[in-house]
């Protein structure tokens, strides 16, 4: 499933304009753990010497966030939700070259307001 193809509403806000929350399903979490491989670390090290954006890490971070978000959406759908509000991201370093990326929010059922 691609986030772009999702039929679930996602927002960082605590409500969705034009919608009424009719049921709160609970907290949903999506987690992924990524390792910065040796090749990426070497390329990033060279790039950091000259300055500027480290594209290898940017791409890895974007992919990890999308994967965590997609997993959160799947959990929300499994609960019967059609929206997730108050979505946030967090990350932690688990080991020297491993990072945990978490997407979390509140799964809810919404209906269009009249």
Curated annotation (Swiss-Prot):
InterPro entries in alphabetical order: UPF0145_dom_sf (IPR035439), UPF0145_YbjQ-like (IPR002765)
SUPFAM superfamilies according to UniProt? YbjQ-like
- Which top-level group of life is the source organism from? Archaea
Pfam families from the xrefs? Answer: YbjQ_1 (PF01906)
Q: Report the family membership.
A: Belongs to the UPF0145 family.
Q: Which HAMAP family does this UniProt record tie to the protein?
A: UPF0145 (MF_00338)
Q: What is this protein called?
A: UPF0145 protein STK_10800
Gene source species: Sulfurisphaera tokodaii (strain DSM 16993 / JCM 10545 / NBRC 100140 / 7)
């Amino acid at each position: 499933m691609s986030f772009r193809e999702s039929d679930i509403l996602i927002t960082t806000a605590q409500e969705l304009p034009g919608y009424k929350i009719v049921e709160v399903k609970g907290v949903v979490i999506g987690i992924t753990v990524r390792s910065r491989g040796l090749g990426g670390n070497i390329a990033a090290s060279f790039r950091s010497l000259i300055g500027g954006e480290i594209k290898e890490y940017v791409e890895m971070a974007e992919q990890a966030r999308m994967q965590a978000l997609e997993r959160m959406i799947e959990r929300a759908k499994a609960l019967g939700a059609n929206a997730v509000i108050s979505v946030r991201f967090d990350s932690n370093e688990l080991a020297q070259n491993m990072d945990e990326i978490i997407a979390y929010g509140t799964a809810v059922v919404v209906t269009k307001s009249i």
